Amino acid sequence: MKIVFLDAATMGDVSFAPIEKLGDFVCYDRSTPQEAIERVKDCEVLIINKVLVTPQLIDAAPSLKLICESATGVNNIDLEYAASKGIPVRNAVGYSTSSVVQATFMQILSLMGEGPYYDSCVKSGRYSSMDIFTDPSVSWRELEGMRIGIIGMGNIGSRVAKIAEAFGMEICYYSTSGTGHCKEYPCLSLEELMKTSDIVSIHAPLNERTNGLIGAAEIALMKPTALLVNMGRGGIVDEKALADAIDNGTIAGAALDVFVTEPLPADNPLLHVRHPERLRLAPHAAWASVQARERLVTQIAANIEKGW
């Protein structure tokens, strides 16, 4: 059985041993559309991450029996055409939950605790020249007693809520699906959540309900001391409106791991704010802990072992 992974560069240095033992495994870091067509000609199992699986690509692989998505979302695959050819598509779910939850609090604590400032204070030598034992020039705040408003109370959002509880925070949420299925915490309107939360944390998928959900009007509802965190998808937040809010002091700060266009274009307004210290940006890496990538490989292997 020949197994081809067309764009494995996003997986980093993880071992593919669980997949390698299943057959003849060929792995490419990246594949252009034309390269992809050449590389799938004799494969039976196709693994992709962001490569577009078009009818043309499927037709170029006459022996293809299974498509494995090395992620949860499958919007890069023509599912209807694959089904018409009798080719099953399997994705991976839940592998990155712990990783994203931890990354969420890494960013929140960095913003709330002024970590970069204090680190610079000591390493730059400023602390060594002080005449008192501490640096009182900046203030940081405790999470205890604050309200966190979670947009999207799925697997990740609910785990964020549990950890927020451990910090002594008050939890509320907005249901992007409109079901309000979680009865453990109050489900608020988006307007009320934005107005009353000290931290707004986004953990929703990108769909017709969430695309452009947080724009200038919604950000303007937030407290001037509030933080906005987006660990969901880039298209949920208007990046220009957020950059303006950071510079104008409409909100205290923001952290983003996802963007409308990835990689982030050099002219993106978030890279040119006047107050970068109020902003934490990460290159869509919240999903990618060592353990999460290992779980992902294990899931892909299990999906192949199921057969077709």
Place the predicted regions along the sequence by residue.
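An anion/phosphate-binding loop that grips the pyrophosphate of nucleotide cofactors and donors
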Residues: 43, 61, 196-197, 225
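N-terminal glycine-/charge-rich "phosphate-binding" loop or analogous flexible N-terminal tail
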Residues: 1-43, 172
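Rossmann-fold NAD(P) dinucleotide-binding segment
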Residues: 52-64, 79-81, 209-228
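Rossmann-like dinucleotide/phosphate-binding beta-alpha-beta segment
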Residues: 14, 18, 134-224
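Short beta->alpha connector loops at strand-helix junctions that form conserved
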Residues: 29, 49, 70-71, 87-98, ...
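Rossmann-like dinucleotide-binding domain for NAD(H)/NADP(H)
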Residues: 225-227, 231-308
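Short glycine-/small-residue-rich Rossmann-like dinucleotide-binding loops
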Residues: 51, 72, 198, 204-206, ...
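Phosphate-binding beta-alpha-beta segment of Rossmann-like dinucleotide-binding domains, i.e.
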Residues: 93-147
